Amino acid sequence: MEGKVIGIHGPVLDLQFTDYTPFERELIKVRDILVECRALLGEGKVRTVALGPTEGIRRGDKATALGKPMTIKVGEQLIGRVLSGIGAPLDQKEEPEGEERSVFNVPPQVTAVLPVSTVLETGIKALDLLAPFPRGGKIGLFGGAGVGKTVLVMELIHNVAIKHRGYSVFAGVGERTREGQELWEEMRESGVMDHLVMIFGQMNEPPGVRAITPYAAATVAEYLRSQYGGEILLFMDNIFRYAQAGMEVSTLLGRMPSAMGYQPTLFSEVAQIEERINSLAEGAITSVQAVYVPADDITDPAPATIFGHLDSSVVLSRALTEVGIYPAVDPLQSSSKMLDPEVVGYNHVQVAGRVKEFLQRYEELKDIIALLGMEELSPEDREVVLRARKIQMFLSQPFFVAEAFSGAPGKYVPLERTVEGFKAIIDGKLDHVPESALYMIGDISEAGVDV
């Protein structure tokens, strides 16, 4: 099971074996790094992708096939640990112990998957009202650079993981090391690390590591689900970087690119991860995924492919960040399959629908207001605009994880109070209250109104 290096192309190594042919995805050791077999070239030649730095490797170096795919050790010892995408410790502690599991598990059978029928309360008004999260489903947070995806993920971890007190897994895929450090500190200080496993494949890692990190995180989440049952939370920041790493690997392997330079297997690669996130009889995995949108183009092939797998989609708007509305959730583009009378109740659906109607009409009137002013509007339209602006202000909310920067204490708003607050605005009960009184507050009672 030994061969040698016959070619080096950055993170791609070509190997030659004489009496053995490695299988697809088999791990091979070259010096002190692992490489993964990704293409069989014939006559004992294979093309591999490195899972570590290739500096210093020479042609002729020995390669040893390990006879197994990428595995990660799972067990109770993982709780509270910070690991790399290949399972190595990043928290200056010893190597984790436990049962080795392949990261390439098969998704559950169709008949084993349970339907998603209950809502997960987040305490964030814009999300709970307009894009309620499903328990045991998949949620995507879409947005370009700098619109607040990571902050929103951190707030969700704070609100949901602390309140939920079950086990959670965080996968940092292709993001900044600084953000990973900040998140680790935040989770440690809040006590969430006692119920959390963190797995990082950061942006400085080779594409092979970034591409394999979501598989490792999904494997740990599946283990926790089977071992402890209940609900497991799986956070991914950023799932787009997984698709991007796959594009890099595909290009390095010499495959013909498809639209926008993406790998031809983009759809199936995304499905391999997404289809493993499900509700089963033994427990459920609820996944929250940040999705970077290149150049704010939601029709880009990667976000568009990910979108098709989601139960709830939250779109973050740059226009809202420019006017200081945080979280910058676009109420007209965000949606959820949970917004159904049989799931959340008729009152919730009606209030959410009317909120969207007010905001949509306000968008249509903006050009007229800019040209002619509010005075030229009919009394009915003027009323719509005033209430829509108050709705927009009330959609803002101070976050716990941003307290150090904003100076405002974070607020958690129960779902029932969220619906009551927006209903009061659209019914005109706050017509006498100035817009500013609704900006960056939690419960509607903070505006001085009892509803």
UniProtKB/Swiss-Prot annotation:
Keyword Membrane assigned: yes
Compartments reported by the entry: Cell membrane
Enzyme class: translocase
Enzyme Commission (EC) number: 7.1.2.2
Main location: membrane
GO molecular function: ATP binding; ATP hydrolysis activity; proton-transporting ATP synthase activity, rotational mechanism
Catalytically driven reaction(s): ATP + H2O + 4 H(+)(in) = ADP + phosphate + 5 H(+)(out)
GO CC terms: plasma membrane; proton-transporting ATP synthase complex
Keywords: ATP synthesis, ATP-binding, Cell membrane, CF(1), Hydrogen ion transport, Ion transport, Membrane, Nucleotide-binding, Translocase, Transport
Positions bound to ATP: G143, G144, A145, G146, V147, G148, K149, T150
HAMAP family: ATP_synth_beta_bact
Assembly, per entry: F-type ATPases have 2 components, CF(1) - the catalytic core - and CF(0) - the membrane proton channel. CF(1) has five subunits: alpha(3), beta(3), gamma(1), delta(1), epsilon(1). CF(0) has three main subunits: a(1), b(2) and c(9-12). The alpha and beta chains form an alternating ring which encloses part of the gamma chain. CF(1) is attached to CF(0) by a central stalk formed by the gamma and epsilon chains, while a peripheral stalk is formed by the delta and b chains.
Function recorded in the entry: Produces ATP from ADP in the presence of a proton gradient across the membrane. The catalytic sites are hosted primarily by the beta subunits.
Family per similarity comment: Belongs to the ATPase alpha/beta chains family.
Protein name per its UniProtKB record: ATP synthase subunit beta
Organism per entry: Coprothermobacter proteolyticus (strain ATCC 35245 / DSM 5265 / OCM 4 / BT)
Name of the gene this protein is made from: atpD
